[in-house]
Structures are given as structure tokens and as C-alpha cells.
């Protein structure tokens, strides 16, 4: 044993060849934390000091290679002054450079996922051999930063600027065959032959058959592009990537600028350029919010794992109510491996549900994401039925009938008589109280809410709603089933609107107030889209459906009359009464017509102004900043109330619910992190400036206390 640590070992294999193996004790994956970096330094020094070493193979003792840096540790460094952050980064980079400079050939054997620092470790090796099932990539831009362990320096010198820019700016994971095409790796083999292939490569390099020094040299030098080639490559890339990323995500363009600034430098000077740019990005609001979301997501995954311990396995599911929603749920279940019965009361509903599932499957086949054989297998996993005959074997039933409490209660009571006593019933309701629906059941402990968002195949969130009598087993089993379907479940307690709709309707309330104050809804949409929302509130209301919004608004007003009830008619009333229901019937705030591909195209329709005229009660002069505040303050304050009321347990769950459920701007991190970014005291003062708009704008006593004590939602 040449070196033995808790994360890394270096052992002799044969004939002077050693294996540097990453295998972090007590963890399921390898990652670069302080311990691993320190041990890599010691391991490299030990190899350097051993004159008998003739070659090094880098490997992993886990199913993955290295997933990247331990962001929970490194995020603390981001708070350091720039000079300290840069110095620390360069110190870490010296380890990778010293490994690269070893006076013997090196081969990285990539057995599984190698991301971020994991791939950067591989780039420092002379040769890379990759299992055909592995994936590699530099996903740092998704955290608002860019690669900081030499990725912006080595990758463009290995695979060319255009390819490197695509990899770094997109943050995508790349399959083995694609990595081989651009020469990011030297060979691809089946996983069982990886060790032998790495050994063969290192022997050929030791013998001189492969010139490892020549292979290494381009990574140490400046880029092989003249001034004109550089200008064409970088300026074109910056323009394209800036258009794709938008102004709120600076990391992709900064990465290109860094590669450009370092183009005429050798490795060590180029690494200094990388470190300076990395420190700049680490201080941005976008990186703070995006890293916060990543950490929130990790917290959610940990919570979901706790439920796994008591959950029952759902081997057979059922959905009640076919149609588009039922078909979407059936598709999602069957495509992820859980067969599902799809029941409706008539053939038309069944046909609609099957058509929806088939449409989604055909779309995947057309895009090359699924084989026709797999499509047939998924369709066979959806069994349509008009009766309860086969429900005796069902583990979990999702009720997805019309959003009416009496209808839902009747259907749930009926199905309860046809399933096993331990079967779980879940209602896909967006607003109706789970505890109210449970009153119709003999076994309310087996009943929960399971709120899918539309369209089911695209929206990642599922709210699992715990009613007053819902058992831990029912909640856990539903969470596990949602995960199995490829969704991100969040457990919420019962209340009108649960989490997402309870928070969304105050946002719509702010929008309604603006329209009634004479503000053009097209302008409001533009301002909120610029703020970062995927679509403005008028367009979103059209997509949701004016009738759906009208019903939801009434449910929320009944549940929270002190702040959500408005006796005046609003824009949604005017459109609903005029039967302008949004995209579903071609007219809402906007008009819609299908383009050549059948996609709904949004058009400005001046006739809506006459419809809205009676609900415009004044003409206020508001700034764009006012528009943002009228919209965002009620949304943020309702999120605070949800946390205070225990509807969600943690700030992380609240923020992730809004990101996954309604497309809250990623770079702003969620409603509670948005408050933190302003400052709790400053946000309370801001809300007080709009207090005359009503109770939705009034901070809670607890929030005022937080402001007074200088507290925040995230440390």
C-alpha cells in the first residue's frame, strides 16, 4: 500500500503500475470534499516520492466515478473575500496540476457518472477510458457558477472551443459515444472490460507505444487558434449563449469570456483567469439562489427517503376518471413501470385517456427517446375498463374525476367497496379539503390527496396531502409511488388550496387589483416575464382556464375570507361571464389559434378591452417596480403563512413547491429566499408601503418579529 486514507488509496497492481482509487468511506458516492482534496494532495505526493511507480490508473470503488464537489462544504468558501476565495481555488488546482505533471503516464478509468470536479480529475489524466454506460459532464452553470478545477482550461484544449463551450454552457451530461466522438475520452468499452482496457492503455504508454507526453502537451499550452479564429469562435458563441441563457443567468456567458481571456495563456496562467472569474460568479445572487435550490432539493430527497422505510410497494395502480388528466397519470405510471387500470363511466372518457397516453408515447418515439417496442409495452401496461372487476388486486387508486366535492365523495365511497382493506385511495384534487372528502369513507386512514399538476408528464411536482386521519403508511406509500413515477413529491397538510394554489391565488389577486386599477394586462405580463416567470399572469390564467381560475378563486375566498374575498367584480368575473375561458375555447385575455403544428398561438385581441371596461375602477399611474410588488408581496406573504401554519414543514419545501409547481424563477430561489435576498426587515417595510391594498399585503406578527431580530429563512 503506497497510500491509505478515508477517501483515497494507492495500491500496487503490477510491474510498477499503481491504482489511485477514490472510495469515500461512509458515503454512497465519491465527491470532492476537503478530506478528499487533502488526501489527493497526499496521494499525489506519495506517488511522486516512489521511484518504482511507472504508471497510474485512476479508478472508483463506487458505482459512480465522482459526482463533483461537495457543494455543502464549498458554499461556505463563497462567503470569503475574493482574494481568499481565489487563493483557495488555486491551491486546490495545484493538486490537479501536480497530478497532471507526474513524470509517469496516467489513465482515468471512468466506470460511472463523472460530473464537475469528477470530470476535471479525469481531464488532468493523460488518457481516459470510459464504460459505455457512464456519463460525463460539467453541470456547474446550473448552480450559477462554472467549472473551477481546471475545466474551462483543459476541456477546450482537448476537444476544441466549440465543443467545450457547448458542454460547459449547457451543463449537460454526455453519453460515452458522444464523449468519444469529440475526443473527450480515448476509448469506450463495456463496463466489465474497463479495468483490462485501462491496464492495456497504461502498459502501452509505459512501453512508449503511446506518447503520453505528447498527449499531455496541448493541455499545458495556449489554445491553437489565431486571433481571427478566436474572435469568430468566441463572439458567435457569446451571442448565441446569451440569447439562450438570458440576462438572469450570467454563468454560461462568463464561462465563454473566461475561456476567451485565457486563450493565449499556458495552463497555470489560464487557471488564474479561471479562478478570478469563478470568484466573481460565486458572489452573484443567481449562484446563491441556484445553489440554495440544489441544497433544498437534496433536503427533499432525504425526507422522501425516510418515507421509503415504511412505504408499501405499489405493484398495481388504478386511476378513476380517464380523460386527459387520467390519461396523463396512466401514461406516467405505466411508462415508469407500474401497470395501471384506467376506469371511466363511458367509452368516450376511455378513448380520450388512451388517446392522451398514445399521443405522449408517439411523441417520445418520434424524438428517438423510446423504441416502438417500449411504446407497445407501456400501452400494454394501461388497461382500460368500465367496471371495478379487477380492482381487487389494486394497491393504490388515484381518483381524478371532476373537481366537485359531492361527486368525488360518491366515487371514493364507491371504489372503497371494491378494493382490498389495505389499498390506498388518493384524490387528485387541487383545492378540495382532504379531511372533508374523507368523511365519506369507512377507512379514512387509507386516504390522502395526490395533487398532480397539468400537464402531468411535464410538471415535476406532486403534492401529497395529509388529511386529519391520513396514516403515515398511506402518506409514505403515496410519496414512494410519486417518486416511482419520476415526480418530486412534497408532503403538505390539509387546507384550502394546499400549498401551491393557496400561494398562487394571492398572486392572481394582485394581478386582478392591477387590472382594476387600469393597468394594461399585456404590460403586466411583460413585466413579470422580465422578472423571470415563464409566462405572465394573464397568459397563465388563459392556460389554466378562466373557469378553473374562477372556481379556485371562489374556493380560496371561502377558505380565507379575511384576505382573499373581494366583493367587487374582477377581470376573471368579467371574462368568465363573457364565456372567454382561455386557450380551451380560443379566447380569454388573449385570442388563440392553432399554428401549422397544431400549437396554440397567442394573439392580442382588442375586443377584450370592452369586456374588461366595467371592472376598471380607477386609473393608477404605476411603475414596473410597483407591478412586481403588487404581484409578489401577496405571494410571498402567503408562503410565509403556509410555513407558519405548518402546511409545509420547512422553508426548503415551501420554495421547492413553488419552483416545481408554478415555475417560480429559478435564479430567485423561491419566495422565502426572495424575501431573504431583499432582507426580511426590508421586505416588511416594503409590504407596509402597500398596506392600503388590503390584508394580503399585511406581514404576519411572526415575520415582523423576524425582521426585528435580524433573522432570515435560510442561514
UniProtKB/Swiss-Prot annotation:
PROSITE patterns: 3HCDH, ENOYL_COA_HYDRATASE. It holds the Pfam family 3HCDH_N. Residues 312-715 are annotated as: 3-hydroxyacyl-CoA dehydrogenase. The record marks 120, 140 as: Important for catalytic activity. Residues 1-190 are annotated as: Enoyl-CoA hydratase/isomerase. GO terms for molecular function: 3-hydroxybutyryl-CoA epimerase activity; delta(3)-delta(2)-enoyl-CoA isomerase activity; enoyl-CoA hydratase activity; long-chain-3-hydroxyacyl-CoA dehydrogenase activity; NAD+ binding. Pathway: Lipid metabolism; fatty acid beta-oxidation. Substrate binds at residues 297, 501, 660. Keywords: Fatty acid metabolism, Isomerase, Lipid degradation, Lipid metabolism, Lyase, Multifunctional enzyme, NAD, Oxidoreductase. InterPro entries: 3-OHacyl-CoA_DH_CS (IPR006180), 3-OHacyl-CoA_DH_NAD-bd (IPR006176), 3HC_DH_C (IPR006108), 6-PGluconate_DH-like_C_sf (IPR008927), ClpP/crotonase-like_dom_sf (IPR029045), Enoyl-CoA_hyd/isom_CS (IPR018376), Enoyl-CoA_hydra/iso (IPR001753), FA_oxidation_alpha_subunit (IPR050136). It comes from the Bacteria. The active site is at 451 (for 3-hydroxyacyl-coa dehydrogenase activity). It catalyses: a (3S)-3-hydroxyacyl-CoA + NAD(+) = a 3-oxoacyl-CoA + NADH + H(+); a (3S)-3-hydroxyacyl-CoA = a (2E)-enoyl-CoA + H2O; a 4-saturated-(3S)-3-hydroxyacyl-CoA = a (3E)-enoyl-CoA + H2O; (3S)-3-hydroxybutanoyl-CoA = (3R)-3-hydroxybutanoyl-CoA. Induction: By palmitic acid. GO terms for biological process: fatty acid beta-oxidation. Its EC number is 4.2.1.17, 5.1.2.3, 5.3.3.8, 1.1.1.35. Involved in the aerobic and anaerobic degradation of long-chain fatty acids via beta-oxidation cycle. Catalyzes the formation of 3-oxoacyl-CoA from enoyl-CoA via L-3-hydroxyacyl-CoA. It can also use D-3-hydroxyacyl-CoA and cis-3-enoyl-CoA as substrate. PANTHER family: TRIFUNCTIONAL ENZYME SUBUNIT ALPHA (PTHR43612), TRIFUNCTIONAL ENZYME SUBUNIT ALPHA, MITOCHONDRIAL (PTHR43612:SF3). Heterotetramer of two alpha chains (FadB) and two beta chains (FadA). In the N-terminal section; belongs to the enoyl-CoA hydratase/isomerase family. This is Fatty acid oxidation complex subunit alpha. It comes from Pseudomonas fragi. The lineage of its organism: Bacteria, Pseudomonadati, Pseudomonadota, Gammaproteobacteria, Pseudomonadales. The gene is fadB.
Amino acid at each position: 500500500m503506497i497510500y491509505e486514507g478515508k477517501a483515497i488509496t494507492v495500491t500496487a497492481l503490477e510491474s510498477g503500475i499503481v491504482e489511485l482509487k477514490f472510495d469515500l468511506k461512509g458515503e454512497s458516492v465519491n465527491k470532492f470534499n476537503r478530506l478528499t482534496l487533502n488526501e489527493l494532495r497526499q496521494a499525489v505526493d506519495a506517488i511522486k516520492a516512489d521511484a518504482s511507480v511507472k504508471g497510474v490508473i485512476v479508478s472508483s470503488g463506487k458505482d459512480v466515478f465522482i459526482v463533483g464537489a461537495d457543494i455543502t462544504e464549498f458554499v461556505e468558501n463563497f462567503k470569503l473575500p475574493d482574494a481568499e476565495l481565489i487563493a483557495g481555488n488555486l491551491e486546490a488546482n495545484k493538486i490537479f496540476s501536480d497530478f497532471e505533471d507526474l513524470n509517469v503516464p496516467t489513465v482515468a478509468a471512468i466506470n460511472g457518472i463523472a460530473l464537475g470536479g469528477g470530470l476535471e480529475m479525469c481531464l488532468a489524466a493523460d488518457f481516459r477510458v470510459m464504460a459505455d454506460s457512464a456519463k460525463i459532464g460539467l453541470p456547474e452553470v446550473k448552480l450559477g457558477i462554472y467549472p473551477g478545477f481546471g475545466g474551462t482550461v483543459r476541456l477546450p484544449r482537448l476537444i476544441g472551443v466549440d465543443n467545450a463551450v457547448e458542454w460547459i454552457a449547457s451543463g449537460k451530461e454526455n453519453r460515452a459515444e458522444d464523449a468519444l466522438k469529440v475526443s473527450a475520452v480515448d476509448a469506450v468499452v463495456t463496463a466489465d472490460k474497463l479495468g483490462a482496457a485501462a491496464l492495456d492503455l497504461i502498459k502501452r504508454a509505459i512501453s512508449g507505444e503511446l506518447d503520453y507526453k505528447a498527449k499531455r502537451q496541448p493541455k499545458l499550452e495556449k489554445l491553437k487558434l489565431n486571433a481571427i479564429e478566436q474572435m469568430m469562435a468566441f463572439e458567435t458563441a457569446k451571442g448565441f449563449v446569451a440569447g439562450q441563457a438570458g440576462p438572469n443567468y450570467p454563468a454560461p456567458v462568463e464561462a465563454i469570456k473566461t475561456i476567451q481571456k485565457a486563450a493565449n495563456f499556458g495552463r497555470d496562467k489560464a487557471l488564474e483567469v479561471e479562478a478570478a472569474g469563478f470568484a466573481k460568479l460565486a458572489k452573484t445572487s443567481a449562484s446563491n439562489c441556484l445553489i440554495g435550490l440544489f441544497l433544498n432539493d437534496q433536503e427533499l430527497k432525504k425526507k422522501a427517503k425516510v418515507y421509503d422505510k415504511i412505504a408499501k410497494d405499489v405493484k398495481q395502480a388504478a386511476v378513476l376518471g380517464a380523460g386527459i388528466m387520467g390519461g396523463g397519470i396512466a401514461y406516467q405510471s405505466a411508462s415508469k413501470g407500474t401497470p395501471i387500470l384506467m376506469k371511466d363511466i363511458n367509452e368516450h372518457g376511455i378513448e380520450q385517456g388512451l388517446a392522451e397516453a398514445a399521443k405522449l408515447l408517439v411523441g417520445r418515439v418520434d424524438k428517438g427517446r423510446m423504441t416502438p417496442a417500449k411504446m407497445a409495452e407501456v400501452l400494454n401496461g394501461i388497461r382500460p375498463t368500465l367496471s371495478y372487476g379487477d380492482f381487487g388486486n389494486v394497491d393504490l387508486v388515484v381518483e381524478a374525476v371532476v373537481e366537485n366535492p359531492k361527486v368525488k365523495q360518491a366515487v371514493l365511497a364507491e371504489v372503497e367497496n371494491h378494493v382490498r382493506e389495505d389499498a390506498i385511495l388518493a384524490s387528485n384534487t387541487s383545492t378540495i379539503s382532504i379531511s372533508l372528502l374523507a368523511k365519506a369513507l369507512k377507512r379514512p386512514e387509507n386516504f390522502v390527496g395526490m395533487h398532480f399538476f397539468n400537464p402531468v408528464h411535464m410538471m415535476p411536482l406532486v403534492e401529497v396531502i395529509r388529511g386529519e386521519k391520513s396514516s403515515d403508511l398511506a402518506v409514505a406509500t403515496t410519496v414512494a409511488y410519486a417518486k416511482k413515477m419520476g415526480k418530486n413529491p412534497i408532503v403538505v397538510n390539509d387546507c384550502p388550496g394546499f400549498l401551491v394554489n393557496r400561494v398562487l391565488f394571492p398572486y392572481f389577486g394582485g394581478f386582478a387589483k392591477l387590472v382594476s386599477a387600469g393597468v394594461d394586462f399585456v404590460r403586466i405580463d411583460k413585466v413579470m416575464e422580465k422578472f423571470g416567470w415563464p409566462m405572465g399572469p394573464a397568459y397563465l390564467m388563459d392556460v389554466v382556464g378562466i373557469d378553473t381560475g374562477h372556481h379556485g378563486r371562489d374556493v380560496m375566498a371561502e377558505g380565507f375570507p379575511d384576505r382573499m374575498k373581494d366583493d367587487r367584480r374582477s377581470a376573471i368575473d368579467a371574462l368568465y361571464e363573457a364565456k372567454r375561458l382561455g386557450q380551451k375555447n380560443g379566447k380569454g385575455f388573449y385570442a388563440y389559434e392553432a399554428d401549422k403544428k397544431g400549437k396554440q398561438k397567442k394573439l392580442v385581441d382588442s375586443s377584450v378591452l370592452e369586456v374588461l371596461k366595467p371592472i376598471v375602477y380607477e386609473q393608477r399611474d404605476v411603475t414596473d417596480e410597483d407591478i412586481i410588488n403588487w404581484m409578489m408581496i401577496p405571494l410571498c406573504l402567503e408562503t410565509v403563512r403556509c410555513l407558519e401554519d405548518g402546511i409545509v414543514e420547512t422553508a426548503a419545501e415551501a420554495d421547492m413547491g413553488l419552483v416545481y409547481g408554478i415555475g417560480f424563477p429559478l435564479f430567485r430561489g423561491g419566495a422565502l429566499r426572495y424575501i431573504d435576498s431583499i432582507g426580511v426587515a426590508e421586505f416588511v417595510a416594503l409590504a407596509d408601503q402597500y398596506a392600503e391594498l388590503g390584508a394580503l399585503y399585511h406581514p404576519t406578527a411572526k415575520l415582523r418579529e423576524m425582521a426585528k431580530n435580524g433573522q432570515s429563512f435560510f442561514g
